[in-house]
From Swiss-Prot:
SUPFAM superfamilies: Rhomboid-like, UBA-like. This is Rhomboid-like protein 20. Residues 250-290 form the UBA domain. Probable rhomboid-type serine protease that catalyzes intramembrane proteolysis. It is found in: Membrane. It comes from Arabidopsis thaliana (Mouse-ear cress).
Length: 293
């Protein structure tokens, strides 16, 4: 199992978020303030340090947490490629906001004024992403080590457990809040899974994501990461599209590779791209609709 093409190709929102998180963590780390970014009852309800709500969403409190956190954020870029940057932006906002709200409610219930009860970092987004990871990403390889069964997904779970236990209860609580937020998104509360930002908002992240870094197109097709799509799915996608016009532009190998890396049949991906005039997002929607029939 892998996360598709290497780098942040077709994942500009993830790229912007990872860079922002790294910069904030390094900035506060240099100042020696990273360990003070965690949320506490005193900060929020007595001193009204509302700015900590925002900073705690991006900056990790230690180097080990930063390493495991960025690794997981980087891997979960696969979901942006699956649903598109616009909907993934909604997922980030929803999971982060709901998780943060749950953390504030937790602080108000515990009323512990002695220390920072909750560690900082994008725990909401990371652990919300484990919901689609568990439900949508199939196991492609299984193996045994000293009689214990493992799969290719085990490494992601182990990284998540390490991050969850990195600060004991200070990190466990934010992780649980993230899992709850991801579950609510999965349940499509208030139709959130259909929500989209205006296009200019989604494209804003693309302009922030420093195109010169990590956006090179993949040189060759990648392995299927979301399960093998049956040939029937490919044929359904082909039948669902009218014959392309003679003047249609031949799909680029880069676009075909991107769709194949998302788990679609190569022939179906090519037909969808022809119909969508080489628009990867539109082709993805066509293929998803074909699968639902």
């Amino acid at each position: 199992m892998n996360g598709g093409p290497s780098g942040f190709h077709n994942a500009p929102v993830t790229k912007a978020f990872v860079i922002t998180s790294a910069l904030f963590t390094v900035f506060f780390g240099i100042q020696g303030r990273s360990s003070k970014l965690g949320l506490s009852y005193q900060d929020i309800f007595e001193k009204f340090r509302i700015w900590k709500l925002i900073m705690s969403t991006f900056a990790f409190s230690s180097t080990p947490e930063l390493m495991f956190g960025l690794y997981l954020l980087y891997y979960f870029r696969v979901f942006e490629r699956q649903i598109g940057s616009n909907k993934y932006s909604v997922f980030i906002l929803f999971s982060g906001t709901v998780s943060l709200l749950l953390e504030v409610i937790l602080l108000s219930l515990l009323k512990d004024t002695t220390a920072n009860l909750l560690t900082s970092g994008p725990y909401g987004l990371i652990f919300a992403s484990f919901i689609p990871f568990y439900l949508d990403i199939p196991v492609s390889t299984r193996f045994r080590v000293f009689g214990v069964n493992f799969s290719d997904k085990s490494f992601i779970y182990l990284a998540g457990v390490q991050l969850l236990l990195s600060s004991w209860k200070r990190s466990i609580f934010p992780g649980i809040c993230g899992i709850i937020a991801g579950s609510l998104y999965r349940l499509n509360i208030l139709g959130i899974r259909k929500a989209k930002f205006p296009e200019f908002v989604a494209s804003f992240f693309s302009r922030l994501s420093f195109p010169s870094f990590g956006n090179s197109p993949p040189p060759a097709p990648s392995r299927n990461i979301v399960g093998t799509i049956s040939p029937n799915t490919g044929r359904r996608a082909e039948r669902s599209q009218p014959a392309p016009l003679p003047s249609s532009v031949e799909p680029s190998e880069e676009a075909i590779t991107t769709l194949v890396s998302m788990g679609f049949d190569r022939n179906a991906a090519r037909q969808a791209l022809v119909h969508a005039r080489n628009d990867v997002n539109a082709a993805t929607n066509i293929l998803l609709e074909a699968q639902s029939h």
